[in-house]
Each structure stands twice: as C-alpha cells, then as structure tokens.
Amino acid sequence: MCKARPTRYAGFMRLFLLTSLTMCAFAANSILNRLAIESGASDPAGFAVVRVLAGAVVLAVLVLLKGGVLPLRSPRRIIGAGSLSLYMIGFSVAYLTLDAGLGALILFGVVQITMFAVGAMTGAAPTVRQLAGATVALGGLAYVLWPAGTVQVDALGAALMVAAGVGWAAYSLAGRSEPNALEGTAANFVVALPVTALALLVAGGTWQ
C-alpha cells in the first residue's frame, strides 16, 4: 500500500506534464501560423501545404524505419484524410482575420464540444469532467461569438475556425479505430497532401 501512492502520484504527474506539453505545442502552432501569415512570410495555402508535407514525410519515414506499411487504400482514409484536410485549410485561412489567442479559443472549444456531442449521440455516458469541460468550452465560445458581445470577431474567420475544429474532432474520433496509430496517421497525412493542395488551389491559392 505504501508503494501504491508514489506510483499513482508519479503517473498523475507524468500525465499532467505530457498534457501541459501538448497544450503548449498546440498554442505555439497557432502563434506560428498567425505570425507567418501576418508577416507575409507565407500565405495560408503555402503554410497549410508545408505543414501537411512535413508531417507526411516525417511520419512516413518513421513507419518505414519500423518496417511498417502505409495503408493508403484503406477506406479509413476517406474520413481520416478528409477531416485532416478540413482542419488544415480552415485553420490556416482563418488566421487571416483572427488573432492567435482568439483562434485557439474557438478551435479548442469546438473540438471539445464536437467530441462531447458525438459521444452523447452514440450512447456514451459522459463523465463529470467531460461535462465540466464541455460547459466551460460552450461558455467561452458563447462569450466570444455572441453578436452583441464586447469581442469583435470576423464572421468568416470564425466560421473557418469552427470548420477546422469540427475537422480536428472528426479526425481524433476516427483515429480511435485505427489498428496501428502510426501507420494510420502517416497514411492520412500522405493522402491529405494532394487533397489540401488541390482544394486551396481551386479556392484561389493566394490571399491578400
């Protein structure tokens, strides 16, 4: 019994540190995206394509080094790559009019609410923490997006970020059924690369 508490505490601290590191990485992602677009160093199309390309290359190399294969023809790629492309496109273009903090708030709120809603509709009983998280996320979104509120939000930018949040939530939910997380993720990025590039090209390619 004496050894159980330190082990449980160590597990909690490990989870806390990994979660904090993940959230910092997500926040840095928003900041770097906004800086790249606002400074003119890249347009949304170029930034999105570079992100997908980098992910595809790194993940594909990891799969090959482990002796795995890329399941590119799996039906799972329809939802996986499609939702990933939706996230990448909406996320990058939205930062033309949204600042980093506001964009991240909308994105994380929508992801939380979407995953909670899907879980509720599929019969999964929500936990107290899930209910609390969804309530906080919904309250934050309502405060930010309320038409008569004090925060001025570009409607198109907000809509694009909402779409990105739905895409990321769908991608996360679809990933739960992947038999091999690394191979499935790598395949999603590889398939999403031409989809993202083509969609942005058709949409205009360059934004001012």
Predicted regions, residues:
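Helix-capping/transition residues at the boundaries of transmembrane alpha-helices
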Residues: 37-39, 95-97, 123, 175-179
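Helix-helix packing/entry segments at the starts of transmembrane helices
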Residues: 50, 84, 89, 103-110, ...
